Amino acid sequence: MTRASLPVSVKAVSWSISRQPVLHNLSFEIAAGETLALLGPSGCGKSTLLKLLAGLNQPESGEIWIGDRCVASARHSLPPEARQLGMVFQDYALWPHMSVGENVAFPLRMRGVGKKPREEQARAMLARVGLEGFTARKPAALSGGQQQRVALARALVAEPAILLFDEPLSNLDRDLRETLVHSMKALLRQSGTTAVYVTHDRDEAEIIADRTLHLAQGQIVSITQSSGEPYVFSQAR
């Protein structure tokens, strides 16, 4: 990737819904090029925090910085397109009427990149995620794992400074999840992109992340370093 990755700083951020606190005074840092997993049970605030980072919600208090720029506070919030983000969702979010190549090239099209260069970049990115030759296919013809690779290629093609993942593998079976999480880790290391990876699965967090932030009831319980050792999914699931 040619665009430099950026650090992220979350400073005393809180958020509530209908006056019920969801996130409580969260503060943490993510180094440029680091992958941080957000781990915790359903309802602990993982996806809410990701939405704040993405610009889909605004903090009630505190600040979020990307690089040397405050992108969100109680007073202002930059929209997602102004934050140099790429996003990968649980449901893939592919357009069924578009080909695989058109889906991957869409962020480049929105930036005004010409047809030929964006097609070339889309083909190159599909090759990087192991889908060379899939350009003309429609998403409906692909398996779940292949669709998630297309979603990852689309997120990476515009060279984002930060990637946000919202439980991207939770709809897939165990063996496929293990294969894909190792592939995603390799791509993140190769690209050097800063990433935030939401999951409820400790195995995924241990494999893909440099560190894991453990959330419970909207508060940080701990931030742990991944072992760095070769790791496989637990047998007992």
Residue map of PLM features:
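Helical segment within the ABC ATPase nucleotide-binding domain
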Residues: R177-S191
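The feature captures the ABC ATPase H-loop/switch
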Residues: H200-D203
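ATP/adenylate-binding site constellation spanning eukaryotic-like Ser/Thr protein kinases
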Residues: A82, G192, Q217
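ABC family nucleotide-binding domain
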Residues: R3-D175, L187
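Conserved H-loop
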Residues: G192-V198
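H-loop (His-switch) and adjacent beta-strand-loop-beta switch element
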Residues: T212-Q225
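ABC ATPase nucleotide-binding domains
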Residues: Y231-R237
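A short, surface-exposed alpha-helical micro-motif characterized by mixed small hydrophobic
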Residues: A205-I207
